Amino acid sequence: MIGVVFLHEISIPKNQNSFLTLHGFTNIDLPMQQSIDLLRRKLGEIYPPGEIIGFTRMIFESLCGYTPTDILLHKDTILSEDIHRKIERITDRLSQQEPIQYILGYTDFCGRRFDIAPGALIPRPETEELTRLVITENSGQPLRIADLGTGSGCIAVTLALSLPGSKVEAWDISTEALEIAQCNARKHNAHVNFFQRDILRYDVSE
């Protein structure tokens, strides 16, 4: 078997600031467009327009199950007070530059949805590209894979599912990260062996 080792960037997430309460709505029966306007107004000086569009799509998909087409065609849809308040809270947290993935509790990776929390780093686009490259170049060939600093487990789970017969190990020093990764493995029915290890102190000769 060919061996593949992933070594992740090691960092400690910053503590998130407690969020403020917004007062963008005065009525309980408001159309979706007013929530979209709130996002643009509160976040326009912090994020570029394209990123705000991405936030809007993710928020309405998560809270309402709406597709981008739904958002475009049904902006006059009346949303419940509960939905409006949730959007207010999400917008406030975004204004504090908290990642949208941590706010919503998930991230998409290689066509699958993974649970995510501040105890695990959010995978970068280049990480997804590298994972797809490994899959493409080793299609049908089982590998021995070590995902070091696995975080959410998205790489380990994706490779275990995409390269059948591979032996996949996932290491992390963080108990919280391993719990998230194991949850994702169960969610996707992927066979991955998890270990709590400090890769900076581990003796590779063992």
Region annotations inferred by a language model:
Residues R85-L163, V168-C183, F194-D203:
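SAM-dependent Rossmann-like transferase core, predominantly class I methyltransferases
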